[in-house]
Protein backbone atom coordinates (compact mmCIF):
# COMPACT_ATOMS: atom_id res chain seq x y z
CA UNK A 1 0.00 0.00 0.00
CA UNK A 2 3.08 2.22 0.01
CA UNK A 3 4.28 3.98 -3.10
CA UNK A 4 7.86 4.07 -4.39
CA UNK A 5 9.60 6.04 -7.12
CA UNK A 6 13.10 6.22 -8.52
CA UNK A 7 14.99 8.43 -10.97
CA UNK A 8 18.36 8.77 -12.61
CA UNK A 9 19.21 11.37 -15.25
CA UNK A 10 20.87 14.74 -15.69
CA UNK A 11 18.33 17.01 -13.99
CA UNK A 12 17.89 17.42 -10.26
CA UNK A 13 16.27 14.22 -8.96
CA UNK A 14 14.43 15.56 -5.91
CA UNK A 15 11.73 17.56 -7.76
CA UNK A 16 11.06 14.54 -10.00
CA UNK A 17 10.75 12.28 -6.96
CA UNK A 18 8.43 14.70 -5.15
CA UNK A 19 6.23 14.99 -8.22
CA UNK A 20 6.07 11.22 -8.56
CA UNK A 21 5.17 10.77 -4.90
CA UNK A 22 2.40 13.35 -5.26
CA UNK A 23 0.88 11.24 -8.03
CA UNK A 24 0.89 8.26 -5.64
CA UNK A 25 -0.93 10.04 -2.81
CA UNK A 26 -4.16 8.26 -3.76
CA UNK A 27 -2.69 4.97 -2.51
CA UNK A 28 -2.82 6.28 1.06
CA UNK A 29 0.16 7.06 3.31
CA UNK A 30 1.21 8.43 6.69
CA UNK A 31 4.79 9.54 5.97
CA UNK A 32 7.08 10.26 3.03
CA UNK A 33 10.75 10.58 2.22
CA UNK A 34 13.41 10.83 -0.48
CA UNK A 35 17.08 9.88 -0.78
CA UNK A 36 19.44 11.53 -3.29
CA UNK A 37 23.01 10.44 -4.05
CA UNK A 38 25.50 13.28 -3.53
CA UNK A 39 28.96 12.03 -4.43
CA UNK A 40 30.18 9.78 -1.62
CA UNK A 41 27.13 10.33 0.57
CA UNK A 42 23.35 9.97 0.39
CA UNK A 43 21.13 12.83 1.53
CA UNK A 44 17.92 11.55 3.12
CA UNK A 45 14.94 13.72 3.98
CA UNK A 46 11.72 12.29 5.44
CA UNK A 47 8.67 13.52 7.33
CA UNK A 48 5.51 12.32 9.01
CA UNK A 49 2.33 13.47 7.32
CA UNK A 50 1.70 14.91 3.89
CA UNK A 51 4.08 15.21 0.95
CA UNK A 52 3.57 18.97 1.22
CA UNK A 53 5.52 18.78 4.49
CA UNK A 54 8.38 17.14 2.60
CA UNK A 55 8.23 19.81 -0.10
CA UNK A 56 8.49 22.50 2.55
CA UNK A 57 11.34 20.75 4.35
CA UNK A 58 13.37 20.43 1.14
CA UNK A 59 12.17 23.69 -0.48
CA UNK A 60 10.62 21.67 -3.31
CA UNK A 61 13.80 19.62 -3.59
CA UNK A 62 16.22 22.52 -3.98
CA UNK A 63 17.96 21.67 -0.69
CA UNK A 64 18.67 18.13 -1.90
CA UNK A 65 20.77 18.40 -5.09
CA UNK A 66 21.80 15.33 -7.05
CA UNK A 67 20.70 13.51 -10.20
CA UNK A 68 19.91 10.03 -8.86
CA UNK A 69 17.48 9.18 -6.10
CA UNK A 70 14.57 7.21 -4.69
CA UNK A 71 11.35 8.18 -2.90
CA UNK A 72 8.64 6.58 -0.79
CA UNK A 73 5.22 7.11 0.73
CA UNK A 74 4.61 4.83 3.71
CA UNK A 75 1.45 3.29 5.12
CA UNK A 76 2.52 1.79 8.43
CA UNK A 77 2.57 -2.00 8.78
CA UNK A 78 5.61 -2.52 11.04
CA UNK A 79 6.28 0.29 13.49
CA UNK A 80 4.44 3.51 14.25
CA UNK A 81 4.03 6.26 11.65
CA UNK A 82 6.90 8.59 12.53
CA UNK A 83 10.01 10.12 10.99
CA UNK A 84 12.31 7.32 12.17
CA UNK A 85 10.19 4.57 10.62
CA UNK A 86 9.63 6.52 7.41
CA UNK A 87 11.60 5.43 4.35
CA UNK A 88 14.23 5.60 2.87
CA UNK A 89 16.40 3.60 5.26
CA UNK A 90 20.21 3.76 5.14
CA UNK A 91 22.93 1.22 5.82
CA UNK A 92 25.22 1.68 8.81
CA UNK A 93 28.12 2.69 6.57
CA UNK A 94 25.96 5.23 4.72
CA UNK A 95 26.74 3.63 1.38
CA UNK A 96 23.21 2.36 0.58
CA UNK A 97 19.62 3.57 0.87
CA UNK A 98 16.48 1.56 0.18
CA UNK A 99 12.74 2.07 -0.26
CA UNK A 100 10.34 -0.85 -0.01
CA UNK A 101 6.70 -1.62 -0.69
CA UNK A 102 5.48 -4.90 0.78
CA UNK A 103 6.00 -7.03 3.88
CA UNK A 104 9.06 -9.10 4.83
CA UNK A 105 7.63 -12.08 6.70
CA UNK A 106 10.95 -13.35 8.10
CA UNK A 107 12.28 -9.97 9.17
CA UNK A 108 12.51 -10.87 12.89
CA UNK A 109 14.76 -13.82 12.13
CA UNK A 110 16.93 -11.67 9.85
CA UNK A 111 17.00 -8.82 12.35
CA UNK A 112 18.28 -11.12 15.11
CA UNK A 113 21.00 -12.45 12.81
CA UNK A 114 22.10 -8.95 11.83
CA UNK A 115 22.09 -7.74 15.44
CA UNK A 116 24.37 -10.64 16.37
CA UNK A 117 26.74 -9.51 13.63
CA UNK A 118 26.84 -5.98 14.99
CA UNK A 119 24.49 -4.09 12.71
CA UNK A 120 22.62 -1.22 14.35
CA UNK A 121 18.90 -0.68 13.79
CA UNK A 122 17.35 2.76 13.98
CA UNK A 123 13.72 1.87 13.18
CA UNK A 124 11.04 -0.69 14.01
CA UNK A 125 10.40 -1.53 10.34
CA UNK A 126 10.84 -4.78 8.48
CA UNK A 127 12.47 -2.80 5.66
CA UNK A 128 15.64 -1.93 7.54
CA UNK A 129 16.83 -5.55 7.48
CA UNK A 130 17.06 -5.27 3.68
CA UNK A 131 19.56 -2.43 3.59
CA UNK A 132 21.75 -4.09 6.24
CA UNK A 133 21.69 -7.37 4.31
CA UNK A 134 22.87 -5.50 1.22
CA UNK A 135 25.70 -3.92 3.20
CA UNK A 136 26.64 -7.35 4.60
CA UNK A 137 26.81 -8.96 1.16
CA UNK A 138 28.46 -6.05 -0.66
CA UNK A 139 31.93 -6.82 -1.99
CA UNK A 140 32.16 -4.22 -4.72
CA UNK A 141 29.34 -5.52 -6.95
CA UNK A 142 26.11 -3.59 -6.25
CA UNK A 143 23.84 -5.88 -8.26
CA UNK A 144 25.17 -9.13 -6.80
CA UNK A 145 24.77 -7.81 -3.25
CA UNK A 146 21.12 -7.03 -3.91
CA UNK A 147 20.50 -10.42 -5.47
CA UNK A 148 22.05 -12.18 -2.46
CA UNK A 149 20.05 -10.05 -0.06
CA UNK A 150 16.83 -10.66 -2.00
CA UNK A 151 17.36 -14.40 -1.89
CA UNK A 152 17.12 -14.21 1.91
CA UNK A 153 13.78 -12.42 1.94
CA UNK A 154 10.45 -14.18 2.46
CA UNK A 155 7.36 -12.15 1.62
CA UNK A 156 6.43 -9.46 -0.87
CA UNK A 157 8.57 -6.56 -1.94
CA UNK A 158 9.20 -3.93 -4.55
CA UNK A 159 12.58 -2.35 -3.83
CA UNK A 160 14.48 0.68 -5.00
CA UNK A 161 18.13 0.98 -3.97
CA UNK A 162 20.93 3.51 -4.51
CA UNK A 163 24.65 3.21 -3.72
CA UNK A 164 27.37 5.87 -3.41
CA UNK A 165 29.86 3.70 -5.34
CA UNK A 166 27.59 3.91 -8.43
CA UNK A 167 26.12 7.41 -8.10
CA UNK A 168 24.31 7.40 -11.46
CA UNK A 169 22.67 3.98 -10.98
CA UNK A 170 19.46 2.92 -9.26
CA UNK A 171 18.40 -0.71 -8.91
CA UNK A 172 14.83 -1.98 -8.67
CA UNK A 173 13.63 -5.45 -7.63
CA UNK A 174 10.17 -7.01 -7.68
CA UNK A 175 8.65 -9.97 -5.86
CA UNK A 176 4.85 -10.12 -5.48
CA UNK A 177 4.52 -6.31 -5.46
CA UNK A 178 3.99 -4.11 -8.53
CA UNK A 179 6.91 -2.25 -10.08
CA UNK A 180 7.05 -0.45 -13.43
CA UNK A 181 10.03 1.06 -15.24
CA UNK A 182 9.71 4.31 -17.16
CA UNK A 183 11.86 4.59 -20.30
CA UNK A 184 13.06 8.12 -21.01
CA UNK A 185 15.69 9.86 -23.14
CA UNK A 186 18.80 10.55 -21.10
CA UNK A 187 16.83 9.66 -17.98
CA UNK A 188 14.99 6.64 -16.61
CA UNK A 189 12.46 6.01 -13.86
CA UNK A 190 10.66 3.40 -11.81
CA UNK A 191 7.47 3.53 -9.77
CA UNK A 192 4.89 1.29 -8.15
CA UNK A 193 2.19 2.79 -10.39
CA UNK A 194 2.22 4.25 -13.91
CA UNK A 195 0.45 7.34 -12.56
CA UNK A 196 3.81 8.52 -11.23
CA UNK A 197 5.47 8.10 -14.63
CA UNK A 198 3.15 9.57 -17.25
CA UNK A 199 4.29 13.17 -16.72
CA UNK A 200 7.76 12.09 -17.85
CA UNK A 201 7.30 9.19 -20.25
CA UNK A 202 4.61 7.00 -21.77
CA UNK A 203 6.96 4.11 -22.49
CA UNK A 204 7.00 1.59 -19.66
CA UNK A 205 8.32 -1.87 -18.85
CA UNK A 206 6.47 -4.07 -16.35
CA UNK A 207 8.78 -6.06 -14.12
CA UNK A 208 7.80 -9.64 -13.28
CA UNK A 209 8.35 -11.45 -9.99
CA UNK A 210 12.00 -12.28 -9.38
CA UNK A 211 13.33 -9.69 -11.83
CA UNK A 212 15.89 -6.99 -11.10
CA UNK A 213 16.39 -3.84 -13.17
CA UNK A 214 19.53 -1.71 -13.36
CA UNK A 215 18.82 1.86 -14.43
CA UNK A 216 21.32 4.51 -15.54
CA UNK A 217 20.51 7.75 -17.39
CA UNK A 218 21.18 6.06 -20.74
CA UNK A 219 20.18 2.44 -20.22
CA UNK A 220 17.87 -0.07 -18.58
CA UNK A 221 18.98 -3.67 -18.16
CA UNK A 222 16.69 -6.30 -16.66
CA UNK A 223 17.97 -9.52 -15.10
CA UNK A 224 16.16 -12.71 -14.13
CA UNK A 225 16.36 -14.30 -10.70
CA UNK A 226 19.58 -16.10 -11.70
CA UNK A 227 21.29 -12.88 -12.73
CA UNK A 228 21.09 -13.49 -16.47
CA UNK A 229 20.27 -10.42 -18.59
CA UNK A 230 16.89 -10.58 -20.35
CA UNK A 231 15.26 -8.42 -23.01
CA UNK A 232 11.89 -6.86 -22.27
CA UNK A 233 9.78 -4.79 -24.63
CA UNK A 234 8.34 -1.46 -23.57
CA UNK A 235 4.58 -0.86 -23.58
CA UNK A 236 2.93 2.44 -24.47
CA UNK A 237 0.66 4.24 -21.99
CA UNK A 238 -2.31 5.65 -23.91
CA UNK A 239 -3.66 8.13 -21.34
CA UNK A 240 -1.81 11.25 -20.19
CA UNK A 241 -1.41 13.14 -16.94
CA UNK A 242 -4.46 15.34 -17.58
CA UNK A 243 -6.58 12.23 -17.05
CA UNK A 244 -5.41 12.21 -13.46
CA UNK A 245 -6.17 15.86 -12.66
CA UNK A 246 -9.27 17.21 -10.94
CA UNK A 247 -10.70 18.95 -13.99
CA UNK A 248 -12.22 21.84 -12.05
CA UNK A 249 -13.97 19.74 -9.40
CA UNK A 250 -13.29 20.23 -5.70
CA UNK A 251 -12.22 16.63 -5.27
CA UNK A 252 -11.10 13.72 -7.41
CA UNK A 253 -13.98 11.69 -6.02
CA UNK A 254 -16.60 14.10 -7.36
CA UNK A 255 -14.83 14.22 -10.72
CA UNK A 256 -14.80 10.42 -10.86
CA UNK A 257 -18.48 10.19 -9.89
CA UNK A 258 -19.29 12.51 -12.78
CA UNK A 259 -17.07 10.52 -15.16
CA UNK A 260 -19.00 7.31 -14.63
CA UNK A 261 -21.39 7.54 -17.60
CA UNK A 262 -18.42 8.00 -19.92
CA UNK A 263 -16.41 5.24 -18.21
CA UNK A 264 -19.31 2.79 -18.47
CA UNK A 265 -19.82 3.72 -22.11
CA UNK A 266 -16.11 3.10 -22.79
CA UNK A 267 -16.49 -0.31 -21.14
CA UNK A 268 -19.62 -1.28 -23.10
CA UNK A 269 -19.25 0.19 -26.59
CA UNK A 270 -16.23 -1.77 -27.91
CA UNK A 271 -17.84 -5.02 -26.78
CA UNK A 272 -21.12 -4.77 -28.67
CA UNK A 273 -20.85 -5.37 -32.42
CA UNK A 274 -23.61 -6.11 -34.87
CA UNK A 275 -26.12 -6.82 -32.15
CA UNK A 276 -23.86 -9.27 -30.30
CA UNK A 277 -21.63 -9.10 -27.24
CA UNK A 278 -18.02 -9.77 -28.21
CA UNK A 279 -15.60 -10.61 -25.42
CA UNK A 280 -12.29 -11.13 -27.18
CA UNK A 281 -10.10 -14.00 -25.98
CA UNK A 282 -12.78 -15.32 -23.62
CA UNK A 283 -12.47 -18.87 -24.90
CA UNK A 284 -14.46 -20.63 -22.16
CA UNK A 285 -16.58 -23.73 -22.75
CA UNK A 286 -19.41 -22.56 -20.52
CA UNK A 287 -21.27 -25.85 -20.89
CA UNK A 288 -18.54 -27.40 -18.71
CA UNK A 289 -18.98 -24.82 -15.94
CA UNK A 290 -21.13 -26.17 -13.10
CA UNK A 291 -20.50 -23.37 -10.62
CA UNK A 292 -19.28 -19.77 -10.61
CA UNK A 293 -17.44 -18.25 -7.65
CA UNK A 294 -16.92 -14.48 -7.50
CA UNK A 295 -14.13 -13.31 -5.19
CA UNK A 296 -12.84 -9.86 -4.32
CA UNK A 297 -12.33 -7.42 -1.45
CA UNK A 298 -14.07 -4.19 -0.45
CA UNK A 299 -16.15 -2.43 -3.09
CA UNK A 300 -15.11 -4.97 -5.71
CA UNK A 301 -16.69 -7.66 -3.54
CA UNK A 302 -19.91 -5.66 -3.36
CA UNK A 303 -19.87 -5.31 -7.14
CA UNK A 304 -19.66 -9.09 -7.21
CA UNK A 305 -22.63 -9.34 -4.85
CA UNK A 306 -24.72 -7.25 -7.23
CA UNK A 307 -23.48 -9.10 -10.31
CA UNK A 308 -24.24 -12.48 -8.75
CA UNK A 309 -27.99 -11.93 -9.04
CA UNK A 310 -27.78 -11.07 -12.73
CA UNK A 311 -25.45 -13.94 -13.68
CA UNK A 312 -27.44 -16.53 -11.76
CA UNK A 313 -30.79 -15.29 -13.07
CA UNK A 314 -29.73 -15.16 -16.72
CA UNK A 315 -27.35 -18.13 -16.91
CA UNK A 316 -29.05 -20.54 -14.48
CA UNK A 317 -25.69 -21.50 -13.01
CA UNK A 318 -25.14 -21.46 -9.22
CA UNK A 319 -23.12 -18.38 -8.24
CA UNK A 320 -21.52 -17.67 -4.87
CA UNK A 321 -19.64 -14.60 -3.70
CA UNK A 322 -16.65 -15.00 -1.41
CA UNK A 323 -14.46 -12.45 0.34
CA UNK A 324 -10.96 -13.12 -0.95
CA UNK A 325 -9.50 -12.55 2.51
CA UNK A 326 -11.62 -15.47 3.75
CA UNK A 327 -11.58 -17.69 0.67
CA UNK A 328 -7.80 -17.96 0.67
CA UNK A 329 -7.89 -19.63 4.10
CA UNK A 330 -10.92 -21.85 3.44
CA UNK A 331 -11.12 -25.33 1.98
CA UNK A 332 -13.48 -24.47 -0.90
CA UNK A 333 -15.30 -27.02 -3.04
CA UNK A 334 -13.67 -25.88 -6.26
CA UNK A 335 -12.61 -28.01 -9.20
CA UNK A 336 -12.14 -27.96 -12.95
CA UNK A 337 -15.84 -27.27 -13.49
CA UNK A 338 -15.64 -24.03 -11.50
CA UNK A 339 -15.22 -20.60 -13.05
CA UNK A 340 -13.60 -18.15 -10.65
CA UNK A 341 -14.39 -14.49 -11.39
CA UNK A 342 -11.83 -12.20 -9.76
CA UNK A 343 -12.52 -8.48 -9.31
CA UNK A 344 -9.85 -5.88 -8.50
CA UNK A 345 -9.52 -2.28 -9.65
CA UNK A 346 -5.74 -2.22 -9.27
CA UNK A 347 -5.12 -5.85 -10.12
CA UNK A 348 -2.69 -5.95 -7.20
CA UNK A 349 -4.92 -6.73 -4.19
CA UNK A 350 -2.85 -9.15 -2.12
CA UNK A 351 -5.64 -11.26 -0.62
CA UNK A 352 -7.36 -11.53 -3.99
CA UNK A 353 -4.16 -12.70 -5.66
CA UNK A 354 -3.65 -15.34 -2.98
CA UNK A 355 -7.25 -16.60 -3.21
CA UNK A 356 -7.00 -16.70 -7.00
CA UNK A 357 -3.82 -18.77 -6.95
CA UNK A 358 -5.32 -21.23 -4.46
CA UNK A 359 -8.46 -21.72 -6.57
CA UNK A 360 -6.39 -22.16 -9.73
CA UNK A 361 -4.32 -24.76 -7.91
CA UNK A 362 -7.56 -26.67 -7.30
CA UNK A 363 -8.40 -26.63 -10.99
CA UNK A 364 -10.61 -23.56 -11.40
CA UNK A 365 -10.23 -21.31 -14.42
CA UNK A 366 -9.88 -17.66 -13.40
CA UNK A 367 -11.53 -14.76 -15.21
CA UNK A 368 -10.07 -11.43 -14.04
CA UNK A 369 -11.99 -8.16 -14.24
CA UNK A 370 -9.43 -5.41 -13.62
CA UNK A 371 -8.71 -1.82 -14.60
CA UNK A 372 -4.92 -1.82 -14.78
CA UNK A 373 -3.30 -3.38 -17.83
CA UNK A 374 -0.26 -5.47 -17.00
CA UNK A 375 -1.22 -5.86 -13.33
CA UNK A 376 -0.43 -9.06 -11.46
CA UNK A 377 -4.00 -10.40 -11.50
CA UNK A 378 -4.31 -9.69 -15.22
CA UNK A 379 -1.14 -11.64 -15.90
CA UNK A 380 -1.87 -14.75 -13.88
CA UNK A 381 -5.54 -15.04 -14.83
CA UNK A 382 -6.63 -17.52 -17.47
CA UNK A 383 -8.86 -14.85 -19.02
CA UNK A 384 -8.96 -11.08 -18.51
CA UNK A 385 -11.60 -8.43 -19.16
CA UNK A 386 -10.56 -4.83 -18.61
CA UNK A 387 -12.95 -2.20 -17.30
CA UNK A 388 -11.39 0.75 -19.16
CA UNK A 389 -12.35 3.08 -16.30
CA UNK A 390 -9.18 5.14 -16.67
CA UNK A 391 -7.12 6.25 -13.67
CA UNK A 392 -9.01 6.49 -10.39
CA UNK A 393 -7.27 8.75 -7.89
CA UNK A 394 -9.69 9.05 -4.96
CA UNK A 395 -9.18 6.28 -2.42
CA UNK A 396 -12.92 5.53 -2.30
CA UNK A 397 -13.78 3.84 -5.58
CA UNK A 398 -16.70 5.01 -7.71
CA UNK A 399 -16.17 4.39 -11.40
CA UNK A 400 -14.06 1.35 -10.53
CA UNK A 401 -17.12 -0.22 -8.89
CA UNK A 402 -19.60 0.70 -11.62
CA UNK A 403 -17.38 -0.44 -14.48
CA UNK A 404 -16.69 -3.75 -12.73
CA UNK A 405 -20.41 -4.27 -12.38
CA UNK A 406 -20.90 -3.32 -16.02
CA UNK A 407 -18.43 -6.00 -17.11
CA UNK A 408 -20.30 -8.53 -14.96
CA UNK A 409 -23.51 -7.55 -16.78
CA UNK A 410 -21.76 -7.97 -20.14
CA UNK A 411 -20.46 -11.37 -19.10
CA UNK A 412 -23.87 -12.46 -17.80
CA UNK A 413 -25.64 -11.63 -21.04
CA UNK A 414 -22.80 -13.05 -23.17
CA UNK A 415 -22.82 -16.31 -21.18
CA UNK A 416 -26.61 -16.57 -21.21
CA UNK A 417 -26.66 -16.23 -24.99
CA UNK A 418 -23.89 -18.84 -25.32
CA UNK A 419 -25.75 -21.27 -23.05
CA UNK A 420 -29.10 -20.65 -24.71
CA UNK A 421 -30.76 -19.53 -21.48
CA UNK A 422 -31.56 -16.10 -22.96
CA UNK A 423 -32.40 -15.81 -26.64
CA UNK A 424 -34.32 -13.85 -29.25
CA UNK A 425 -36.39 -10.87 -28.12
CA UNK A 426 -35.34 -11.15 -24.48
CA UNK A 427 -31.67 -10.98 -25.43
CA UNK A 428 -32.30 -7.95 -27.64
CA UNK A 429 -34.29 -6.26 -24.87
CA UNK A 430 -31.55 -6.74 -22.30
CA UNK A 431 -28.85 -5.71 -24.79
CA UNK A 432 -30.75 -2.49 -25.48
CA UNK A 433 -31.08 -1.88 -21.73
CA UNK A 434 -27.36 -2.47 -21.33
CA UNK A 435 -26.55 0.04 -24.06
CA UNK A 436 -28.75 2.60 -22.30
CA UNK A 437 -26.88 2.37 -18.98
CA UNK A 438 -24.53 5.35 -19.62
CA UNK A 439 -27.49 7.58 -20.45
CA UNK A 440 -29.42 6.31 -17.42
CA UNK A 441 -26.43 6.98 -15.17
CA UNK A 442 -26.22 10.53 -16.48
CA UNK A 443 -29.92 10.94 -15.76
CA UNK A 444 -29.37 9.67 -12.22
CA UNK A 445 -26.71 12.35 -11.79
CA UNK A 446 -28.90 15.10 -13.22
CA UNK A 447 -32.22 14.35 -11.53
CA UNK A 448 -31.13 14.75 -7.90
CA UNK A 449 -30.14 18.40 -7.33
CA UNK A 450 -31.45 18.17 -3.74
CA UNK A 451 -28.73 15.76 -2.58
CA UNK A 452 -26.50 18.55 -1.12
CA UNK A 453 -29.51 19.73 0.91
CA UNK A 454 -30.16 16.18 2.11
CA UNK A 455 -26.51 16.00 3.16
CA UNK A 456 -26.98 19.11 5.29
CA UNK A 457 -29.93 17.41 6.99
CA UNK A 458 -28.24 14.09 7.71
CA UNK A 459 -24.53 14.91 8.14
CA UNK A 460 -24.73 15.18 11.94
CA UNK A 461 -26.18 11.71 12.43
CA UNK A 462 -24.01 9.37 14.52
CA UNK A 463 -25.11 6.32 12.53
CA UNK A 464 -27.12 5.27 9.50
CA UNK A 465 -28.70 2.06 8.27
CA UNK A 466 -29.00 1.06 4.61
CA UNK A 467 -31.63 -1.57 3.82
CA UNK A 468 -32.84 -3.39 0.74
CA UNK A 469 -33.71 -6.79 -0.66
CA UNK A 470 -32.18 -8.82 -3.47
CA UNK A 471 -30.31 -6.49 -5.87
CA UNK A 472 -31.28 -3.52 -3.69
CA UNK A 473 -29.47 -5.14 -0.76
CA UNK A 474 -26.32 -5.50 -2.86
CA UNK A 475 -26.46 -1.76 -3.58
CA UNK A 476 -27.08 -1.05 0.12
CA UNK A 477 -23.79 -2.80 0.93
CA UNK A 478 -21.80 -0.46 -1.28
CA UNK A 479 -23.82 2.61 -0.27
CA UNK A 480 -23.08 2.02 3.41
CA UNK A 481 -19.39 1.45 2.68
CA UNK A 482 -19.14 4.73 0.79
CA UNK A 483 -20.79 6.60 3.65
CA UNK A 484 -18.58 5.17 6.37
CA UNK A 485 -15.26 5.34 4.55
CA UNK A 486 -15.38 9.01 3.53
CA UNK A 487 -17.73 10.67 6.06
CA UNK A 488 -16.59 8.61 9.10
CA UNK A 489 -20.24 8.09 10.06
CA UNK A 490 -21.08 4.62 11.31
CA UNK A 491 -23.15 3.10 8.49
CA UNK A 492 -24.35 -0.47 8.24
CA UNK A 493 -26.25 -2.33 5.55
CA UNK A 494 -28.83 -5.02 6.24
CA UNK A 495 -31.06 -7.22 4.19
CA UNK A 496 -34.40 -5.57 4.94
CA UNK A 497 -36.00 -8.86 5.93
CA UNK A 498 -33.41 -9.28 8.69
CA UNK A 499 -34.37 -6.14 10.59
CA UNK A 500 -36.78 -8.03 12.83
CA UNK A 501 -34.02 -10.49 13.79
CA UNK A 502 -32.20 -8.03 16.03
CA UNK A 503 -31.21 -4.88 14.19
CA UNK A 504 -34.52 -3.11 14.71
CA UNK A 505 -33.57 -2.82 18.40
CA UNK A 506 -31.05 -0.16 17.35
CA UNK A 507 -33.60 2.13 15.71
CA UNK A 508 -34.06 5.36 17.67
CA UNK A 509 -36.04 8.57 17.19
CA UNK A 510 -34.54 10.39 14.21
CA UNK A 511 -32.35 7.46 13.11
CA UNK A 512 -31.63 7.82 9.37
CA UNK A 513 -32.57 4.72 7.37
CA UNK A 514 -31.74 4.72 3.66
CA UNK A 515 -34.15 2.32 1.98
CA UNK A 516 -33.38 0.96 -1.50
CA UNK A 517 -36.62 0.31 -3.39
CA UNK A 518 -35.78 -0.25 -7.05
CA UNK A 519 -36.52 -3.96 -7.36
CA UNK A 520 -40.20 -4.31 -8.23
CA UNK A 521 -40.33 -7.99 -7.25
CA UNK A 522 -39.62 -7.22 -3.59
CA UNK A 523 -40.78 -3.61 -3.31
CA UNK A 524 -43.95 -4.39 -1.33
CA UNK A 525 -41.90 -6.30 1.23
CA UNK A 526 -39.41 -3.45 1.54
CA UNK A 527 -42.29 -1.02 2.00
CA UNK A 528 -43.45 -3.05 5.01
CA UNK A 529 -39.96 -2.66 6.49
CA UNK A 530 -40.13 1.09 5.94
CA UNK A 531 -43.38 1.16 7.90
CA UNK A 532 -41.72 -0.83 10.71
CA UNK A 533 -38.77 1.52 11.15
CA UNK A 534 -40.90 4.65 10.84
CA UNK A 535 -43.14 3.32 13.61
CA UNK A 536 -40.03 3.39 15.81
CA UNK A 537 -39.09 6.96 14.92
CA UNK A 538 -36.72 6.47 11.99
CA UNK A 539 -36.26 9.14 9.30
CA UNK A 540 -36.48 7.29 5.98
CA UNK A 541 -34.63 8.42 2.88
CA UNK A 542 -35.84 6.19 0.05
CA UNK A 543 -34.21 5.51 -3.31
CA UNK A 544 -36.76 4.54 -5.95
CA UNK A 545 -37.66 4.82 -9.61
CA UNK A 546 -39.08 8.15 -10.69
CA UNK A 547 -42.87 8.05 -10.48
CA UNK A 548 -43.13 5.54 -7.64
CA UNK A 549 -45.94 7.22 -5.72
CA UNK A 550 -46.26 4.46 -3.13
CA UNK A 551 -42.75 5.04 -1.82
CA UNK A 552 -43.15 8.82 -1.94
CA UNK A 553 -46.14 8.57 0.38
CA UNK A 554 -44.13 6.61 2.96
CA UNK A 555 -40.66 8.17 2.95
CA UNK A 556 -39.55 11.38 4.64
CA UNK A 557 -37.15 12.17 1.80
CA UNK A 558 -36.65 10.82 -1.71
CA UNK A 559 -33.83 10.16 -4.15
CA UNK A 560 -34.91 9.15 -7.64
CA UNK A 561 -33.31 7.05 -10.35
CA UNK A 562 -34.63 6.44 -13.87
CA UNK A 563 -36.59 3.27 -14.57
CA UNK A 564 -34.22 0.43 -15.52
CA UNK A 565 -34.50 -3.34 -15.64
CA UNK A 566 -33.93 -4.53 -12.03
CA UNK A 567 -31.23 -6.93 -13.24
CA UNK A 568 -29.17 -3.98 -14.45
CA UNK A 569 -30.25 -1.10 -12.22
CA UNK A 570 -27.52 -1.30 -9.56
CA UNK A 571 -25.11 0.66 -11.76
CA UNK A 572 -27.43 3.69 -11.78
CA UNK A 573 -28.90 3.09 -8.32
CA UNK A 574 -25.52 3.49 -6.61
CA UNK A 575 -24.76 6.87 -8.21
CA UNK A 576 -26.95 9.06 -5.94
CA UNK A 577 -25.66 7.17 -2.89
CA UNK A 578 -22.11 8.04 -3.95
CA UNK A 579 -23.17 11.68 -4.21
CA UNK A 580 -24.89 11.56 -0.83
CA UNK A 581 -21.76 10.15 0.83
CA UNK A 582 -19.63 12.78 -0.90
CA UNK A 583 -21.73 15.74 0.22
CA UNK A 584 -22.14 14.40 3.77
CA UNK A 585 -18.35 14.05 3.98
CA UNK A 586 -17.94 17.57 2.62
CA UNK A 587 -20.34 18.93 5.24
CA UNK A 588 -18.27 17.17 7.90
CA UNK A 589 -15.00 18.61 6.60
CA UNK A 590 -13.48 15.21 5.87
CA UNK A 591 -10.43 14.51 3.72
CA UNK A 592 -12.58 13.05 0.95
CA UNK A 593 -9.93 11.91 -1.52
CA UNK A 594 -7.65 10.45 1.14
CA UNK A 595 -9.73 9.19 4.08
CA UNK A 596 -7.87 8.43 7.28
CA UNK A 597 -6.45 4.92 7.76
CA UNK A 598 -7.36 3.86 4.20
CA UNK A 599 -5.24 3.03 1.17
CA UNK A 600 -6.24 2.80 -2.46
CA UNK A 601 -4.40 -0.34 -3.38
CA UNK A 602 -4.16 -2.98 -0.64
CA UNK A 603 -1.01 -4.75 -1.78
CA UNK A 604 -0.24 -6.34 1.59
CA UNK A 605 -2.24 -8.94 3.49
Region spans (language model):
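Conserved short alpha-helical segments that host acidic/polar catalytic motifs at enzyme active sites
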Residues: 1-251, 259-270, 274-288, 302, ...
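Acidic/histidine-rich
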Residues: 156-187, 459-485, 520-522, 527
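Generic C-terminus detector
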Residues: 227, 539, 554, 564-605
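Glycine-rich phosphate-binding loops that contact phosphosugars or nucleotide phosphates
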Residues: 288-436, 516-560, 580, 588
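Glycine-rich oxoanion-binding loops at beta->alpha junctions
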Residues: 67, 71-84, 267-284, 307-343, ...
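Active-site phosphate/pyrophosphate-binding segments
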Residues: 260-264, 268-293, 383-512, 585-605
Amino acid sequence: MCGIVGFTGTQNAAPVLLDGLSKLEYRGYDSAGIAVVQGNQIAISKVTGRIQNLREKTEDGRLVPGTTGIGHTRWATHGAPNDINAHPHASNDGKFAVVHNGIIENYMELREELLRKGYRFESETDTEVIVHLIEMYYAGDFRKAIMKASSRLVGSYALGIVCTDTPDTVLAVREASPLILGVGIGENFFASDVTALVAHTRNVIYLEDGELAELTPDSIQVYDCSGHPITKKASRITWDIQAAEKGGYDHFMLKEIMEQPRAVEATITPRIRNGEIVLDDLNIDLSQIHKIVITACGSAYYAGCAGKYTIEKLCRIPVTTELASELRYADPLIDGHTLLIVLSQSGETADTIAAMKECQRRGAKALAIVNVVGSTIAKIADYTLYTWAGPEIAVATTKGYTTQLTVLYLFALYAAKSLGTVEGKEFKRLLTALRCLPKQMQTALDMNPAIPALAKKYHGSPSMFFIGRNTDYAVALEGALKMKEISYIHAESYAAGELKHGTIALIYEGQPVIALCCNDAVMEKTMSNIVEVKARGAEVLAVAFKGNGKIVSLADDMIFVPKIDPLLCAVAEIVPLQLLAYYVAKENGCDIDKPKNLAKSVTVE
